[in-house]
Amino acid sequence: MLSRDRLSRLGLALGIALLAGACLRPLYGDTSPAPGNQNVRDRLSAIEVQEATNRIDQQIRNDLIFAFTGGAAAPEPLYRLRVETNDALQSAVVDPFTSRPTTETYALDATFRLDRIGSTDGKPVFQGRAFGRASYDRSRQRFATIRARRDAEDRAADVVAQQITTQIAAHLATNP
């Protein structure tokens, strides 16, 4: 049998859980009760992503377009997303005999800006930063090292695209 003290603690914990549960809502759920309002998923699919200038930017662009539309046809764009990236290599471990790095980290930093198409005030709807890091081992075989670096670049680009998608979705969910 439960004591009165344990019963009151259990009741308090249950009450807190119920209150906290009422505060949470799904990010991509339909939260627009008024007809004509768009939910987050519809607003994300109406984002046009700028053209890419290199392979890494194209990887990020492809990941963003798929995350926004889910592979479906995009509707008429309401927003334009601009992403600028900077990348660098960081040598983590250096072989003491050859003075060559044996492990490197590919660092990708991105700044992004979401603008409303047709807006004349010049203020962004949302802007932010994202970053991705991916390590890889350097081999004595040149082509293995090139492929490992390319895979690290792709992994870092995926992380950046996921961070951008999550930040924009959270902003659009809280700022209709």
Predicted regions and their residues:
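Sec-dependent bacterial lipoprotein signal peptides
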Residues: 1-23
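Hydrophobic and amphipathic membrane-targeting/association helices
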Residues: 2-3, 24-29, 79
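Bacterial Sec signal peptide processing site at the extreme N-terminus
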Residues: 17-43
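Post-signal-peptide N-terminal segment of Sec-exported extracytoplasmic proteins
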Residues: 41-76
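Active-site oxyanion-binding pockets that recognize sulfate/phosphate
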Residues: 46, 50, 54, 143-154
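Surface-exposed short loop/turn segments
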Residues: 66, 71-151
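C-terminal/domain-edge helix-coil "capping" segments
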Residues: 147-176
